[in-house]
Structures are given as C-alpha cells and as structure tokens.
Amino acid sequence: MPTNDLHARLAATILTQLETADPASWTPPWHGADPMPRNARTGRRYRGINVLTLWCAAQAQGYADARWATYRQWAALGAQVRRVERATLVLFYKELPRGTDADPTDGAPFVARAAHVFNAAQVDAPPPPADAPAPSVASDPLPAFDAFAASTGAAIQHGGNRACYVPATDTIHLPPRSAFRTPTGYAGTLAHELVHWTGAPHRLARDLTRRFGARAYAAEELVAELGAAFVLADRGIARAPHPDHAAYCASWAPLLRADPRALSTAATQASRAADYLTTMQEAAECRLPPRAGAHRVTASIETAKSRTATPDYITANRYQRLS
C-alpha cells in the first residue's frame, strides 16, 4: 500500500467515527488505558502515526496486548501468526545510501516504507511479556505525575475556572485540583497544557500556521490532545474523555476533510512534544543543573476571568467538573 493511502485510511477511520458515532459517547482510539504499542522483537515503542494506527486496530479488535511485530519477527521469537489473521500496516523510514558527491552537511536521505505487523493476540505461542511489564494504571497517579510536571520547569498556576497555556507570559493556568472529578482528569488536563507549552519559540517552535493556515488552531489542539495521550500512556495513566469532548472535537472533522494528512502531521508533532517532556524529566533525574524558570505552582491566583480567547490565550477547556 502506498504510504499516502495509509495516511488517508487513518484519517477516514477517525472521520467516520466523528460523523457517525454519538458525539456524547464517542471514545477516540487514544482514550482508555492502553499502553504505548511496542515492537515485540526490539522492545522499542512505535511513534507518531503508527501509535494511532495500532491503537485503532486494538480498539476495533479488542486487543489487550501492546506488543506488535512482523511475521518474520514473530517467527524469530518462536511464535506463529495464525493463517486467518490480517495484518495492520505501519510506516518506517529507511535511510538511503549517500552518493559519492553528496554534501556531508545535508541531512541523511530517508524514504518511507510500509510494514505488516500482527498483535500478540494474533499469534500462537507468543513469548511471555518482558521482565518489565507495561505500567499498570495507577489509582492515584498525581504524586508521580506531579514530579514529572515539576521536572519540565513549566510555570503552573492554579485558580479560576479555565485551563489554558498563555504564550504571552509562558504560563499554564489550571482550575484548582478540587474542581476535577478524578486525579486522572487533572493529569490529563495538565498534560494537554504541557504539550501546548512545548510549542513555544524557545522550545520546539511549533508553528502550524504555514501548514494549516486558518485551521492552525484546530491542528494545535489536536497535537495537544494526542501528545497528552502519549504522555499519559507512557506513564500507565488511563485517558478519559471529558464531558465536553464532543464539542471540543468538532473542529477536527473539517480539518481532516480538508487535509487527510493532518492527523499524521499532528501525531508526529505530538510525539516530538512527548519526547521533549520525557527528555526533560530524564535530565532532571540525572540531577543536571536546574534551568532558569523552575517549576512554580501557585495555590490561588487572580486569573483572567475577564479574558477572552485570543491568539495569546490558548484554551483547552479540559477540566471535567468545575464548581
């Protein structure tokens, strides 16, 4: 299958769900407790569009195992793919050989290739999971997640009734913890805003206006939604849709109709954001010198109750209940 077809198929799957499902009860493939899919042979986790593709397949088929591999990889592990099973396509990028006259300062040339992978539930005699199993969904993920958020150095202020990242002040604003129904609701909202935070010019410099024009806001929100899902899945935290998610996702349908590759682009940017946040956590765990702008949490603030949504005020409205 051409790689363009894979992008289009994934977009069509999500678009069909958006247009035919009950918006109030629709569960996107990136919501739930599924861990990040990993390759059974190498142990490496999949990235970008492949995560969404494999989550979609797992949701449709009811796969609970996060391990995937090609036919040959399963065979090398002593497992046999059953004849009746159908593969799921993923993309990988292969480096091409350089010409003798190539400029060594240029980036290495890559070409996209498709691979057929099967879930562990589709094979006979799969090996047992690795010694380090996927993290279980924590009943109270806040202590570990708070440490993760602190490691980013983001300025986080609590108070008011809005969840947003403000580029002008480079701060994240959240409602009080007591306003959220569950700890995972709080963690999901904070993860969403942290992904927005990574897009600042002095971080990942994520500017989607050239790529999406007037739909850049919807694309950025999709990046934050997917990035939050990746961050939480890596930490074994269940992702649950908030009550307003149907209205919140309404802008995605026009985006996907106009550009079938928008979902893939957003997934790639979301992976970069999640990796950026994880790298900051790893650096903090290595006890590197603290960066300027250490993490600050204010218990109560006078937030901008009179502010309206402007280009400098990116609002997610990800809270689950506000009192």
Named regions from a protein language model:
Residues M1-S323:
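N-terminal accessory/interface modules of nucleic-acid-binding and processing proteins
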